[in-house]
Each structure stands twice: as C-alpha cells, then as structure tokens.
Amino acid sequence: MIQQYNPFKKDAFDILLPDLVGIQLESFSTFLKKGLIEQLRDFSVITDPTNNLELRLLVEQYKLKRPRYNEKKCIRRACTYASQLYIPAQLINKKTGKVQEQDVFLGEMPIMTSRGNFIINGSARVIVNQIVRSPGIYYKREIDPKEGIKTYSASIICNRGAWLRLETDKNGFVWARIGKVRKVSGFILLRAMGLTKSKILNSLRHPEFFQKTIEEGDPYSENDALIDLHSQLYPERPSTLFAARELLKSKFFDPKYYDLGKVGRYKINKKLQLSIPEDIRVLTPQDILTAIDYLINLEFNIGTLDDIDHLKNRRVRSVGELIENQVRVGLSRLERMTYKRMAESHPDALTPASLINPKPLVGVLREFFGSSQLSQFMDQTNPLSEMTHKRRISCLGPGGLSKERAGLAVRDIHPSHYGRICPIETPEGPNAGLIGSLATHARVNPYGFLESPFYPTKNRKVFKKTLPIYLSPDQEDELRVSPGDLLLSSSGKLEGKTVPIRYKQDFSTSRSDQVDYVGISPIQAISIATSLIPFLEHDDANRALMGSNMQRQAVPVIRPERPVVGTGLEAQAALDSGTVIVARHDGIVSLVDSNKIILRSSCGSNQTKVDSVGLNFDYQIDRYHLQKYNRSNQDTCINQRPVVHQGEFIKKGDILADGAATVGGQLTLGKNVLVAYMPWEGYNFEDAILISQRLVYDDIYTSIHIEKYEIEARKTKLGPEKITREVPNLGDYVLRNLDENGIVIPGAWVEAGDILVGKVTPKEDLDQHPEGKLLRAIFSEKARDVRDTSLRVPNGVRGRVVDVRRLKGSELPSGVNMVVHIFISQKRKIQVGDKMAGRHGNKGIISRILPRQDMPYLQDGTPVDMVLNPLGVPSRMNVGQVYECLLGLAGHFLGEEYKLIPFDEMYGKEASRGFVYSKLYEARKKTGYPWLFDIANPGKSQLFDGRTGEPFDQPVTVGRAYMLKLVHLVDDKIHARSTGPYSLVTQQPLGGKAKHGGQRLGEMEVWALEGFGAAYTLQELLTVKSDDMKGRNEAQHAIIKGRPIPKPGTPESFKVLIRELQSLCLDIGIYKIDKTKKGQEIDLMMSM
C-alpha cells in the first residue's frame, strides 16, 4: 500500500484553488445574463423613415431554446452545439394604432459546454482570453534626441470611436489630434465645445502656459471655432456650422459612435479625480479641460506618467465580452437591413418576423467562432493541455498587438504580473511574452482587471483565518506586500525583523511590522502547469518554461501511473479539467459497466430511507455515461474507466471514473522509470536517450492514437458521385473489407493502400460516336464511364477501424450528398526517434533500444530503464531533476508518494537536499541496502555493465524519474518517396509529408557541390533527378532495360525563367543544334 507523504504537514498550506476553468464559465454566464441584454437594448427600437412604424424588441424576455442535439451527438454529427435565440417583438403602426406581437427568430447562439469550450462543426474550440490596453487616459513623456527637450502627450483611448491625443510641443503650444488626421489647437477644440476663455483659464493650475496657445487663435467665438475645427480636419469638405456641430457630436458626444465603456469612465475619473457618473460613457468638455490641465502640470513636474505595461492599464477581454462585441456588429447590420425593409415595403404587409432577417447575426457569429484569431482548435493532447488552453491570455488578435510590431517591453515580465500572470509559462518562438497563462489564484474582476488574493497583516500578525482579500494591480502599488513563502511562528506572526516585500513596483526589504499584506501561497505567482513541477526552485527559468510547455504535449499512455514525487496539485488539475466523472449526489452504486455507472441517490436527505420490509424507497437514479475510445483533436485517445464497484456507498464529489491521463482522480502524464545519469558508448550524445527493451515489451509507454479520415460524395456537372462497392478494375481481395454499400466494416484491420470507402466519379465522355450515343440512350447513365476516386489508407498508416459514421441530409453543405468518417485506431509502442522529456525541461530523442540484459544494472541486480547524459544537467542548471530522481528512488523502496510544494527554502537552507538525503537514509535502513545512501558519494551508487558484468569506473547517480512520452512521434514525421506528385509549373517534386513530397536540392546544396567541383553529380541532380521531364522518363526506361543512361536535357525551371523574361518583353530563346538534320536549330521552348 503506497501512502502519500507530506514532509511539512504541520505547516502545510491550505491551498484552496479557485475553479481553474471558471474564467470561461463565469464570463459566458455574465454574457447571457447581462451582456446580451445590454447589446439588444441598444437596438431595441427601430423606426421607419416616415416615423409611422416602430419595431420594439422586448429584450428582457429573450428565450434560448434547448439545443437540438446534446454535446455527444453534435460531435458525432459534425454540427454546432447551439441554441435558437427568440425575442418577443412588437410592430406598432402609429397611424392606425395596430400592434402586432410575435416571437422573432434571431439566429443560433453557440453555447458553452460545462467544460468551458464550444463545439463548432463537431470540433471542440476554445475562445482565448485577450489582454488589451484598457480604455482610459495615458500620459507619456518624449525627449527630443537632438535638443533634449521634453514634450508630453495624453492619449484618451475608448472602446468604440476615435482616439483623442493631446500633446505639447517644444515651443510650448498645446495641440489636439483626433484619430489619425491632422492636429488642431487645443484652445480651438475647447472653444468649439462651448467653453469660454475665462472658464478655461480659471480651471487651469498654470494658465500662463496655455496663454501662448490662446494668443495663437484669439479672438474666437464658439461658432468660429467650430467652423475652423471642421476646415482644419476636413479641408476638402465645405465647412458649415451644422456640419461642424454634427462632426464634433459624432466624434465624442454621441453614444452610438463613441463609447468609453464603464472601464474607460472609471479610469478617467480616477486619473483626473473627477466625479462624472459612470453611466455617462461619452467624453465631456470637463474631461478634456481637466486632461489638458494635467498635461500642463506635467511640464511643471506635477502628476505622474503612466506605464502602459502595468497591469492596471491592461484589461482582460474574456469570451463573454468578445462574443458581445461580435453580437453588436451583427445587430447593427441587422438594424440597417430592417430599416431598409421598413422603408421599401407596404406597412400592412409587414410582420415582425418578416422584418427581421437573422442572417447578419448568424454570419458574424459563424465567422468569429470559425475563423477568428482568438477562436482556436482546442488542445486535447491531455487534460492539462486542455485546461491550460482555457486559461491562456493572448496579446494578439483583433484590437491587440501583432507579433511583428511587438517590442521587448510588451513581452517582458512586469512586477505587476506577480500573482496574476505566470512569469514562466509562455511559448518559445516569435510569440514569447505575447501569450501567457493565468496564475493559479488569479481572477478577473468585473472591470476586466486581474486580481490576486492576499492575507491582511497587522503588527506582524497574519490573519490566515479570515477570507483572503483580492487586490487589483493599482491597489497593490500603494501597499507593502510580502510573498507567500514566508515562515510564520506558531502564533501566526511573521518571523525575523526584515522580510522581502514589493512596494511601488520595486522589490526590496522592509521591517516585518510594516507589512500590509502577505501572499496566500508559495505557488501564487505561477501557472497550474508550472506548479506541477517538483523542486521548481532548483531549476533555471528557461528550463522550467520548457518543462511547463512539454507537460502539455505528453501523450496519455495505456496504463498511466501517479508520480512518486508530485506537488499536490495533480488532483485539482484533473478535477477541473473535466476529464474525470464526479458524483453529483450521495448514493449507492447500483450498476457499473465499461459504458455507464448508475447511482441510486437519496432524495431530500443524505440517507436512503428503508421501510420495514427492508426495501429502499424515495430515491432518484443518476446515470453517468462514460466516453469510450473517442478521438481527440490531436488524435490521442479519450477514454474513461470506472473506479467504483457495485454496492459501494459514494459521497457527493467522489470520483466515479478516471480519464485517459488520470489515476484515482490525480493527473498522470507519464511513468516512473529507473534512470541512470552516465554516458553509454556515445548513444546519449547531445541529449539522446538510451532505453531498455522492457519499456517496449511491457507496454510501459504504449499509447493509443485514433485518426480520422473523411470522404464526400458530391454532385458534379456530369452527375452525382456514388459511394459503392462496384469500383471498376478492382478484384475481390482488394474489396474484402467493404460491406455491401462500399464502406469498410468496423473491426477490420487495414494497411497502407487498402480501400476504406469505395467511390466512383463520372468521367467526361470523350466518345461522341453514334454507337456511344445509342448505348447511352438505351442503358441511360449506366453505360457512362466512371473513375475510381476511393478513399484509401495513406502511406505509413495501419490499424483497426474502430468507428464508421455516415452523415446525410440537411446538415450537409450544399452540393454534398453524403459524408463518411472512418476512425482508425493504432497502438504505438515507444521506438527510436520518439521524443521524451522529464518535467524539468530535460528532453531528448530515443537513439537506441537495448536488450534489458545489456543495460547497466544496480547492486541488487535491477537493470535500469533509461540512460541519460549527465552533461545535460550542469550547463542547463535544472538540478530539480536530480532531486526528483533521488527522492523517487527512496519513495520506491519505502512505498511512499511525496507531495512537495515548490519553494521550500523557508524551512531552512538546503531544505530540499536535507529531506532527500533523510529519505535515502531511511530507505537504506529499511531495505538493508547500504549502497542506497553512501556517505562518501551521497545519491550515487556503483553500477555494473550488463554486457560484461564489470563495474563502471565511477559511481553513478541513479533514481526514479517521472518521464513523459511527447506527442512528437516519429511515425507522424518519418517519410520516404520514390516517385510521387510534381508541381505543374516547375515540374519539381512537391514538398512535405502531407503532399507525399520529395526532397528539394536547394541553393545551399548546389553551392556545396559547386565547391567540390562535382559537375556531373550536379548536372544529374539538377536535370534527370529533378525537372527534366523528357530526361527523367528516358532515364527510368534505361534503368529498367539495363541500358546506359542518356544525356540530360533542359530543366523545366529554366524554361519557366525564360518565359518570365519573355513576359518582360525580352526576346530570349534557347535552341539546340540537331546533328541529324544538317545542323538545323530546334527551339527548345516549342518542345515543351
């Protein structure tokens, strides 16, 4: 019996993590309850041009119908999980007083599943959270590089409408720039808004600075200022007073065209210390006047500049808000269309349903969910990757940054990220720093700002019994905050006179009695994937980043295993990912099989009532259906296994069934294997890995992969394509796996080239003879020629057909009669070329599989499973792997599992090393193996060569490490081609495995051969082996018949070059002298 062991139990952190996918579920719930109603309310009244007809939408009474199919059926039928949206509408004829009421269909709204994702066209998709500049006002300073003069600017950013930029120049003028058009004087803008000169000057703290700007444009009336503003902004248009007023109104004062949003209003009020009501979401003259006053004050060193990378100036747009923005776009199009119909149709012929066309809204939502940069194909490699995808935060996408324009400042870690965005987990490539992950305890407040929880502290006393207080980034700036890995005394007070703190974006130390707040957990600053790395504090950040990312790429193996050394977050990660089944009520398991679990739960009380005869009554039945061998988006296998037994009593919240990568409700991504850090005959050079045959024979790293193949039968100009067994020119053996309809039988074993679905396509009839026409007239279409376009198993694929799905009817796109999906399952054992990794960024490729008798073995005769290169540790500085493997070894012999939360140095210096050594010593005492803890070489042991039985020269570090098999499998990458498709233009082989391409001899390869003067080899590679069409055919025939290979001809790409030069009107030709015809010239371009 393996017991779980927490080394620091008495000081263990009560880490109650929030729901890890709550950010998605809460945001979508808010959208349905508030956001959708708000957007509909803006378009709730539409009036026709004559003002006689009025269409009213009763938005609070909107209805969402139950989706037509459940989630499972939507995936099977390749359709969208969505609800129909209906709104009660009234059409009021003001002339006659007639009112028509009707429920109007507004389109289908995709609905989020209980796991926080959407199902679009049968595939799981995630809407990624976007982090953008918050609406508000931002001040910044610019210094002229030549003269060193400082100028200041203020940008007013809105949700919707034109940006306004106020700026000072080196001559002391104040300017305003609206959108991207030319700038105007700040005084003209204020006068055009109706402010008098005296009001302006009285409101400024330093009116003398603004005097210069006033003198430039004085004397001015309000009307003069309006016309001047219009003429300066749009000199090509005639400037009238009405046009000028309308321009100013539409730019800043009309809620339809300009919206600061509640966040923008809140930020402007806070920065400029105004008290304008939150429901006024347009700019006011007071806003602009106060903004200019603040700008002038900066010239006198009064006020503060803004850091745009601070999280108080960036907000998160979650799924609800992103859909809300799309709904607004769709509704504005729908409003225009409805207005047009009202104007064009007779009032008596109109009904609410005939006026409203749902197409604009449906089209916008389809485009957003199907092709937006923020709507992504869900990463379903394992439960962790699924959950991390839902917690991802991206700077990219519409309204955000682009990776080409993003500088280093945006990508960098900022002090305000602490406890909100993980400083470690981010991609490695061009998106580094632009895509992050939410920290474990972070949450998004109603304004969209990220908050982190802290315990209040007073006079060194930390109030851990109270609920933690969530602080926003701007609140935290003004407080002294200590990290969560400080050791407290038994009375709950901070120990030591000084403690590390963060104050005003600076990391320093402070007296412990001055601390305001303390973090609630040591893992508060990092993401869920990073917090699954044990001994994280001993790893370099770059390697921890790789470890976090590679855990998401781990393939679930057939028999997963809990890590001996974990961090305690595995259970929460598995639970919140939604891959395990949890009991909804207390009850007794009445039936368990591989497909379902039936729970008989008591109603109204925790106990099932029993009558006098002993029969149960007053209970309800809960059915839980298990997912069996379903395909994920990444072709891995989704499978659930029951963990309860019939008759067992279950409490609410207990685990009923495990997922593909969970054991006992805990996340299990890999296997514990015996590793040795030593070189072995050069086979582990440069991160290569040497493994034992045991891992292959015992299916230690065997995984199931399910691939999907589909084929469509379409309508063509020559008639419909047919799915049939009657395929021309094929024998019975080739068709052995097909049923009478021409579709493969589930359970059939198929190899590369086998037919999965027989299909014939009508061929264009070239036979225009009278006999052919007569035959067609007699036998109708039957005599028409068809060609074989069957779906075959691609090269390199073999496996068992596990499922066949036929789709017919109205759900298919137009022009398609039938779609068939075939699912082929493969069992993939570990093999040379597969990629493996630990949790510390220690990755490598398998270079050789040795028989277990040849592997190095321990002093008790156990052969090791894996040999890693010791040089992969010192330079990479990921020493956490050494601690993990040694503690894993001790845990294996002691029968214990360990949950070690990262950052344990608060328990004393070298706490990790002390704990690992103590456990090794304990294992040595229990087993009687002195080599488990050798005081001369702690952590190392004498190993013996399996081939000779001789001991190795030096003691070797041996331990049990948790190693993962990654999704980068050699079977998916290896590719070979003898003959295959060519590009039509250049006649060169296509590229890539997907197109069955070949290798290309690029420029650098040509240079290499030129450098060695290999002229004939080069000529052969550039002609016969590449794109000399005539030459390659002749060469093939010569090889088959055993004749000498003829001389090469002209490459096709050279002919393409000549054609391109001819298209530039250059008269260039290439000719060959024919020696057989008296030296006659032959135009090679004509022989194409």
From Swiss-Prot:
Compartments where found: Plastid, Chloroplast
Top-level division of the source organism's lineage: Eukaryota
Reactions catalysed: RNA(n) + a ribonucleoside 5'-triphosphate = RNA(n+1) + diphosphate
PANTHER family assigned to the protein according to its UniProt record, in alphabetical order: DNA-DIRECTED RNA POLYMERASE I SUBUNIT 2
Subunit and partners: In plastids the minimal PEP RNA polymerase catalytic core is composed of four subunits: alpha, beta, beta', and beta''. When a (nuclear-encoded) sigma factor is associated with the core the holoenzyme is formed, which can initiate transcription.
Protein family: Belongs to the RNA polymerase beta chain family.
Official protein name in the record: DNA-directed RNA polymerase subunit beta
The encoding gene: rpoB
